[in-house]
Amino acid sequence: MKKLKKDMLYVILTALGIVMIFPFFWMISCAFRRPNELLTSPPRLLPASPTVSSFIHVLFETEVPRYFMNSVIIATTATVLCICVAIPAAYSFARHNYRGKNLVMVCILLCNMIPQASTLVPLYRAMDRLQIIDTHFGIAFTHLLCMLPFSIIMLKGFIRTIPPTLEEAAMIDGCTKLQAIFKIIVPVCSSGIFATAMYAFMISWEEFLYAMTFSTSSRARTISIGLKMFSTEFKVDWSSILA
């Protein structure tokens, strides 16, 4: 009976694995097809005549590599800024009790609920005055606004699991409050910081509206904007998108 249950579990897990992997397999298979093969009926699992023409087109005939590097720079900058701001903010909420703390936390939560579209005009005017439109830092700053509220809440939960006695012991040994944060809290909370950084990086990488609004040339356009350019009013270049 136990062996039957174990075999059934393996069958179910294998089936789930196939279901999860199949979209990636299909994407790779379609990337090696010619455009006229993509919409054939019935569909084929493997390309009839594999070709790398889509990859050559994307890598050497478009600005996708530049958009990719822009995304890496912007997402990395936004993530670093987010973590640098979120750690002290989360520490303050997790360790100190002061008047209005709960109100501030509610305001942070509400900031996460504000629709992006409603912030476009004031942000555009502010960024225009600062002359950071169509720059890596400008778009990274707008991404920071998207990811910071939830990052603070995430890190607050991780920091609250650390016993305050560790910091007290460090300060007895001569550490200042700031040194205790960077020598005790940050190393102990490294897994939580890494998880928060991954969340922030993914939010920045996938963000579309701010990147489209505040980038006016290829100098700061991200990969999400680059992929959108393969889709026009009359045609969608699926081969290039999948490549």
Please tell me what each predicted stretch does.
Residues 2-243:
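A structural signal for multi-pass alpha-helical bundles of membrane permease subunits
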